[in-house]
């Protein structure tokens, strides 16, 4: 599994600890130092079945500064993916990617269901 995080994020820290406590092996990736590429984001979006908005860090400063709440309603998926790929701080985190799933954010129950704990 691939675990994409911002190490200073308390939710990411909690999710990482949860993975470790539950014995899951994962590759760790820093979302700012190694920002997801547009192609990766598109692949994850398709695999997840989630709406594109779920990939945006809607509580982040950058999201608010760019006025994305209103912009997202009027731009294409391609434009939105380009925006996400431009800055890791715009991307919802953590992201957990497995062979057949993609999860954004950390909600313990959802992770338990996906990982069949």
PLM feature segments, named:
Residues 1-22, 26-29:
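Local sequence-structure signature of Cys/Sec-based thiol-disulfide redox active-site neighborhoods
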Residues 33-117:
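Thiol/selenol-based redox catalytic cores and closely related redox-interacting motifs
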